[in-house]
Amino acid sequence: MPFRKGWTLIELLTVIAVIAVLAAILLPVFHQAREKARQATCISQLKQLASATLMYAQDHDEVLPCFWDYYDGEGKFGGWIFYSTFAQCLPGNFDPSKGSIYPYIRNAPIYTCPSDRCRQGNSYAYNGALSPNPVAKVGPGFHFGLPLAAIQEPANIILFTEEETGHGSTDDGHHLPEGNYPTTRHHGRSNFAFCDGHVKALLPDNVPSQNFRYWP
């Protein structure tokens, strides 16, 4: 019977060291790949939300939905999403099914970015400038969405973005440039959907303020 040489301690430690080095190299690569996949999913979801919003406008005399988060009954005017409570990082704050664009999607999970750890039921924010006078809302039945014709450069005007949660305010579903801010969940970038339906990943600091306005 031939003699079988066993592993020496040095050989075993060498193998362990090589495995540790490979793990240190490969784990960040795997993490980046997973995050890229999550970002791609987020981009797809924003495209669906933008498409649903534009379909809503086509069915409502070319007028966009209101960003205000109130409910006026299924199929009626109301906010693009319903916000049920003003408390941060508690599950179920949002009820997409009561939002005005939900009949065009009917898929609540797409309202949450897979990289969003807060899990409130919504990760996205509507451009507040597209509802020109939300303060004047006095109750259900009032509609303050902007006519599509008023948007002079739809390819340059932001429709949705990923909202920062916990930045001095709740993640309330609408973005006000001076209040709530885009988050940077995807390697320092945030996904932005524009009024023509396309989506880009951008550095929030590089987005000019006029991209939030419907006028040039």
Which role does the model predict for each range below?
Residues P2-F3, D59:
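Short alpha-helix boundary/capping motifs
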Residues F3-S44:
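Amphipathic alpha-helical segments typified by the pilin-like N-terminal helix
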